Amino acid sequence: MESWLLVILAFLVLERLWPLIDSLIQRFAQANSTKLKELMHQRQAILAEQKEISAQDQYVKWTKNNRTLEKINKQIEEEKKQLLSQVDRTKASLKKVKLVLITVPFTILKFYKGKMPIYDLPKGLFPNYLQGLFQHGWVYLALGPLNIKKVGDGTHVTVSLAIWLFALLKVVSTLGNIWESLTAPAIPAPTITTDPIDQTNESEKPPVDQPVD
């Protein structure tokens, strides 16, 4: 049982870490775009040169640099489009790899070993329908009321792998949501401004007539 549990935990860790692996591979592909790096370096060099020359005194050179900049900018945009297309192809390939190596085997393993007992709980600690759910999994919700599945005799109730995984994933998801809420950037409070129309109307209010003695 321990070996199967370790295999399932390994699949679970890989499934949770896969978005990070996906992101790292995409960043690696973007960082290793040699042509884009060269084009960006050339553009920075020309921009630095443009700041040091005068458009009036060195008009020919200044115009030539501008044309070169336009050409480089177009090449940069084309290279970015090709890079995005490459990233999309990489994403599609990674999805197929994940489906074959993680999703399908993990799903089959969960169905195949879903009823495997993980640990025992004292009987009577939870209501009877929960104990049946722990022991038989989700099938107890349908078969329990028909008395087809019953809680076993004895002083303890086993917790099946399917229910244990469900509880574990819920805990991991909740902790992830808490972490995201704690690390999310604070949203600044909206500034309250007075409507200029209201200010104009207030300034144009006629004076109040004072009583004449």
UniProtKB/Swiss-Prot annotation:
GO terms for molecular function: protein-membrane adaptor activity. It is a multi-pass membrane protein. InterPro entries: Get1, Get1_fungi, Helix_hairpin_bin_sf. It comes from Kluyveromyces lactis (strain ATCC 8585 / CBS 2359 / DSM 70799 / NBRC 1267 / NRRL Y-1140 / WM37). Residues 193-213 are annotated as: Disordered. Gene3D superfamilies: Helix hairpin bin (1.10.287.660). Keywords: Coiled coil, Endoplasmic reticulum, ER-Golgi transport, Golgi apparatus, Membrane, Transmembrane, Transmembrane helix, Transport. The chain crosses the membrane at residues 5-25, 99-119, 159-175. It is found in: Endoplasmic reticulum membrane; Golgi apparatus membrane. Residues 55-99 form a coiled coil. Signal peptide: none annotated. Its main location: endoplasmic reticulum. One of its GO terms (cellular component) is Golgi membrane. This is Golgi to ER traffic protein 1. It holds the Pfam family CHD5. GO terms for biological process: tail-anchored membrane protein insertion into ER membrane; vesicle-mediated transport. The keyword Protease does not apply. Required for the post-translational delivery of tail-anchored (TA) proteins to the endoplasmic reticulum. Together with GET2, acts as a membrane receptor for soluble GET3, which recognizes and selectively binds the transmembrane domain of TA proteins in the cytosol. The GET complex cooperates with the HDEL receptor ERD2 to mediate the ATP-dependent retrieval of resident ER proteins that contain a C-terminal H-D-E-L retention signal from the Golgi to the ER.
